[in-house]
Amino acid sequence: MQPPPRKGNYVKFLKNLHTEQVAKLQLKNQHECDLLEDIRQFTIKRSAVEKSYSESLLKISSQYLNKKIPNIPDIKMEGMEERWNMWSVWRTVLEENEKLARARLAAIEVFQQQIADEAKVLRDYKLAIAKRSLAGIVNVQKELHLSVGDVDKTKKSYFDEEHCAHDVRDKARDIEEKLKKKKGSFFQSITSLQKNSARVTSRKELLEEKSSGARNDYVLSLAAANAHQNRYFTVDLQTTMTTMENYVFERVAEYLMLMGRTELLTCSATQNSFGKIRDQAQQLTREYNLQCCYLFYPVLKQHIQYDFEACDNDPVRKVTAEHESAAETLTKEAKNLAGRVVKENASIRENAKKLALCQSLRDSGQRTDPNDPNGPDLDTKIEEFRDQIRRSETEKTKAEACLQCLRDGGINVDEWVQEAENMGVQELTRSASSISMRTDASGQGENPSSDSFYDSDKEETQAAAQTKPKQEQQLSRDRTFSDSEDEPEVRPSAAAASSAAAASSSMMASSAGGWDDPTEVNWGAGEEEDDKDEPIVPEPKEAIFKCTALYSYTAQNPDELTIVENEQLEVVGEGDGDGWLRARNYRGEEGYVPHNYLDIDQETAGSAFNGTSGNQLRSQISFSSVDYTVDNEDQTVDSMQSPDQVSVIMAPQKRVKSDVEWCIALYDYDATAEDELTFEEGDKIKIITKTAHGVDDGWWEGELDGKFGNFPSLVVEECDEMGEPLSEGGDESPPPTAAPTFALPPAPALPPEYAHELELELTEDMFGSQDTADEDSGYIPNGAAAPSIPPPVLIQEPGMEDDLSDDGQPPPSLPPPQLAKAGGSAPGSGSKVEKGAAAGGANTLNLGMAQIIVTAATPMVEDGADKSFPPVGESDAQPVEPVSKEQPAEVAKKPDIAPKPLAKVAPQSAPAKEGNAGVRPVVSITLTEYPSCDAEDQQSFSEGTDSASVADVPVLQDAEDPFNEKAKGESGDGSGFEANFEANFDANFDDAFAGIGGGGGGGGGGGEQSNELDINGEAAGEAIVSGSAAGDEDIEAPKQVVGGRASIPEELDSNQLAHYHEHEIYYVDYSHGQL
């Protein structure tokens, strides 16, 4: 056959070639079957002429010698051992039988039993299997036609685009030459030439970009087609030929060897003749016979490969990413191809396992699968699995060829391949689902749609229909290889969602009486238990405790459970340890749910899970636990906080890092080399080094049971000496039952008349107007308090356990904090703090700092790392109200004392719940006492406060220097505070304070400052600090804003966003006339 033409349709030529190949394969099989039939008939007829052996054998031998035998020549080369194909040997057999016809009387019976019968069975099987094999190769050829058809399409498009681009390039070159010569025609000026040059240049760039894209498509389709051709020739065609042969060469050789051996035993007279037949038959091999067949049928040896055909001397021969759009498209293509390779590898492994299982069942005598007796037989299943493996291998080969093509073009495909392989390893612990919710122990993950639910009144078949897996779609070449978009998220109707929410609300109301208050935990008992060294008690498997669903979740796998927001559930197990728990609903259905979707009942959990294992489970679903890092580390959020119940936020006990590192095995691993370790899941390994080969290639060196070796880091997880996994920040989670303590400075001793008055007013503001809130709509009128006031959030830093006694009260040396009125009442009501005399004649003008704590519900997931705070356009929706003259709160100013550091609070993620309308933040102010000031400062303060006019106080702008670098250099006492502040809030200062109406500033001669905090859409309070100190500079204390909009999920609608913007946590530090 001639090679494919350089010009023309590839598909047409390929179809003709494949048709001829199928015909020759069928002819080859027919020849083999004819040969088997000839051997069988020959043996039978020899047996029939036993009595007249000599005469009849001579006649028969001559008959078959005269028959037209395929003249497949032998390969004869100088210096090469003489060899024969099976047709030549058969011809030798006939010739020798013609001479030795009389010696075959004794061997007729042996021939009849061992040759004739088996040859008939083999021939019938070959005829039957040839039909299936030829049908299969035709289907494979059709797939190859599609791939080559893509080459024709992309080639045509490339030639068209390149022709256009080439013409425009020539035209642009002519215009540029005319411009260089500055010579126009009689009817054309230089200006018109310049305009034409600009127009033609822009058109040239556009057409070159199109030509480049068409060339890239052509190169990619060419690579895929060539890879498919390689696969077809080396695998599909060879497999079909082997299947059709069914060891016919070996069987024929066996038959002929048997003939020769029998004849030698029966007749010494024929020893020489049949010795020759035997020797030739022993040299029969499939390889040599195929070589002879290839020589006789050259079309079977024709292997087609396509080369890139450049258009108009195009110098580019590979994929290029010269243009931005091409680079982006090729990068996306590389990512999709890498994902397809990993996917096809997984499919090959899975189908190979199924194929091995079916083959073992067939070898054991089974005809059908015992697990599927009504299904197809094992042979059909085996063929299906083989075909699936073949398809997967073909797709994998094409994808790898395209990846290599992209790699040759300078595209970074190795990064995507590594990422796809890592994702494949990480997803081994869960069943395959592209939209299943996967979370870690910290509760961070993709927040599912808030309106996902199930209706308990519907039939179970509807729920099963929602989770039914979709059939895999066949993707074309120009589509993405990723199948993540083939499974859209199922969203029920709004009416069904509202009915389910109403049903769950009524169920919540009936069971709310049994909920525990997390603030009533016996902290003293918890401390005593922590001090004791108790043995680790394994968690009982049958422990059951109640919990509440914080969000709705639709099951994506058969082993998961669909839950509705506020639904009462029972947790019956810890799941597989990757952020899932096994729960049971009121209908008795059990399944896995994400643990951070649950709000656990602490009392029930405490009674059900005792000891260390209980604490571990409770820490997974704790109401709130916040990690704090001080030494320039990012703040992390470990879990979620229920908006209905506020728990104690604690700073964790920092882990004392050891010089020895440990890791625990997540999977079994068998060593593949002498320098590797073999271990099983759960083994604890001591890490020697993380750069086993001198570079960070993902292999670690460790010690297990006294044996040293290397192992992959992907199958292990770092842990401590006890085998407990380490958290992301390297610190252990704090014990959930630790008691809250205060770490604030001593409170000032206010005059009795003011202290009593402030306490009464604060109590009235917090609890006086609870019944006026609109619970149904979630709207809180001005001046109205929330229906329920959660306790304030308290802070505990490491080393502060000694600040409280066992009963939770401050020690005698630390006076209790005094309460001051917070700006939570209606406008027009306020309080004024004035100086007074303390007992013992000491100077009582010691107010230097005030701390405002607002506790409110905030969303659970912090996905607003790249959002501004507040969001764009929100500052206009909530304008800052002017300062009221009736709401000043004047405090003393001491310029020589820097503020002491406050305990810092990290943003606490809490779920977004629309049902908690009416929850309103609680504000508490703690006044901090500083050392007494002298008489001159008191006089200066008195004069400044009496003469200051609140009406003249301007609204502060955003601070340009929030950290007051100059003040940091002059203040020694405040250095610790600012170091801690910068470490925790420098990263998110711009996002946290962008758009807030209010600021701070200070000058050398003192000043007046104000700040308004917008809480629940109204002015919640103002803090105005005035003072005068000539020649002294004010030290501006940095501001802290914790929580708020930065962690609101993206899928909340506009009214939900407005609701959560009303619940913020602000910290304001007042010291020396600064906000």
From Swiss-Prot:
Supply the source organism for this entry.
Drosophila melanogaster
Q: Which GO terms describe its cellular component?
A: axon; cytoplasm; neuromuscular junction; presynaptic membrane; recycling endosome; synaptic vesicle
| Region (Disordered) residue spans | 361-381, 431-536, 722-747, 769-837, 864-917
Name of this chain's protein? Protein nervous wreck
Q: Which InterPro entries match?
A: AH/BAR_dom_sf, F_BAR, FCH_dom, FCHSD_SH3_1, SH3-like_dom_sf, SH3_domain
State where composition is biased (Polar residues).
431-453
Q: What is the effect of changing E676R?
A: Decreased interaction with F-BAR domain. No effect on interaction with Dap160
Which keywords appear in this protein's UniProt record, sorted alphabetically?
A: Cell membrane, Cell projection, Cytoplasmic vesicle, Endosome, Lipid-binding, Membrane, Repeat, SH3 domain, Synapse
Q: What is the lineage of its organism?
A: Eukaryota, Metazoa, Ecdysozoa, Arthropoda, Hexapoda
Q: Is Membrane a UniProt keyword of this protein? A: yes
Residue ranges with Pro residues bias: 733-747, 809-818
**Per its database record, what is this protein's job?**
Adapter protein that provides a link between vesicular membrane traffic and the actin assembly machinery. Acts together with Cdc42 to stimulate actin nucleation mediated by WASp and the ARP2/3 complex. Binds to membranes enriched in phosphatidylinositol 4,5-bisphosphate and causes local membrane deformation. Required for normal structure and function of synapses at the neuromuscular junction. Plays a role in synaptic vesicle trafficking. Required for the release of a normal number of synaptic vesicles per action potential.
Residue ranges of domain F-BAR in the record: 11-289
**Cell membrane: is it a keyword of this entry?**
yes
